[in-house]
Amino acid sequence: MVPEAGTNRGEFMRYYISDCHFFHGELNDKMDCRGFDSTEEMNAYMLKKWNAKVRPNDEVVILGDLSWGKPDETKELLNRLNGRLYLIIGNHDRFHENNAYRYDRFVWMKHYEELKDNKRKIILSHYPIMCYNGQYYRNEKGEEKTYMLYGHVHDTMDQ
């Protein structure tokens, strides 16, 4: 379980991110056209931005597709990323099948999770879920009480 931000370990931020696709050259060149001259330049830029924002004590919930890299490349990357990492496994996270990654760099690796964050229920999945647990719950002000966070969709839902 992911602890509530600001409890248990002192003050920290929790970030949610998806579809970084480290080491995915075609994503840079053809699919998302990220505009970097090389995959190495893309990786270096994302790593620099990540570590400029995320402190070592912060938590990062990754909603899948962290890395398209080989196991050794991904392991090196993981050791350079700041933060306590939680992984919702995506369809491109091939490295998760390698038991070498079931080590303390990830607090956990799962396909689905429900947690509390800032007094809200959060549903986590790499894929969008049309009807998710608690989606119709409202608080006394009529505001949503449950949020679905997902990745996978890079452009529009109809793709």
Predicted regions and their residues:
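Core catalytic region of metal-dependent phosphoesterases/phosphodiesterases
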Residues: 15-18, 22-117
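Alpha-helical hydrophobic/aromatic positions enriched in membrane-embedded helices and signal peptides
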Residues: 11, 57, 142-144
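Conserved beta-sheet core of the metallophosphoesterase superfamily
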Residues: 103-159
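Short, Lys/Arg-enriched N-terminal segments with co-localized hydrophobic residues
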Residues: 1-12
